[in-house]
Amino acid sequence: MEAKAVAKTIRIAPRKVRLVLDLIRGKSAGEAIAILKLKNKASSPVVEKLLMSALANAEHNYDMNTDELIVKEAYANEGPTLKRFRPRAQGRASAINKRTSHITIVVSDGKEEAKEA
């Protein structure tokens, strides 16, 4: 059984979020939370909050024991890009892309559910 949580349009570039997600993928929930609390990255608090949400979803929606859960999937896709311009010399302007992320975390208890035929 698995439960997931999704955060959309987070104002951190997906490349930076993936650095943190790579650290917690495959870890137990408790270990992942400990890693996120100690990691000094801008995306750590956001990912930690999302992981807590996934754990709460698992407990509330599926009556799963949060102590047994592992982070099965953790990925960040690109969200909409905010396009801005910075004035430059001689009347020119440079484009600035402010990237956003859609972050998804899936937690699982390791047990496969019976598939309906």
UniProtKB/Swiss-Prot annotation:
Concerning InterPro entries, the annotation shows:
Ribosomal_uL22, Ribosomal_uL22_bac/chlpt-type, Ribosomal_uL22_bac/org-type, Ribosomal_uL22_CS, Ribosomal_uL22_sf
Protein name per its UniProtKB record = Large ribosomal subunit protein uL22
Q: Which CDD domains match?
A: Ribosomal_L22
Q: Which UniProt keywords apply?
A: Ribonucleoprotein, Ribosomal protein, RNA-binding, rRNA-binding
One GO location term (cellular component):
cytosolic large ribosomal subunit
Q: Which family does it belong to?
A: Belongs to the universal ribosomal protein uL22 family.
Q: Name one GO biological process term.
A: translation
Q: Tell me where the transmembrane regions lie.
A: none
Q: What are the GO MF terms of this UniProt record?
A: rRNA binding; structural constituent of ribosome
Describe the subunit structure. Part of the 50S ribosomal subunit.
Quote the function comment for this protein. Answer: This protein binds specifically to 23S rRNA; its binding is stimulated by other ribosomal proteins, e.g. L4, L17, and L20. It is important during the early stages of 50S assembly. It makes multiple contacts with different domains of the 23S rRNA in the assembled 50S subunit and ribosome.
Q: Which domain of life is it from?
A: Bacteria
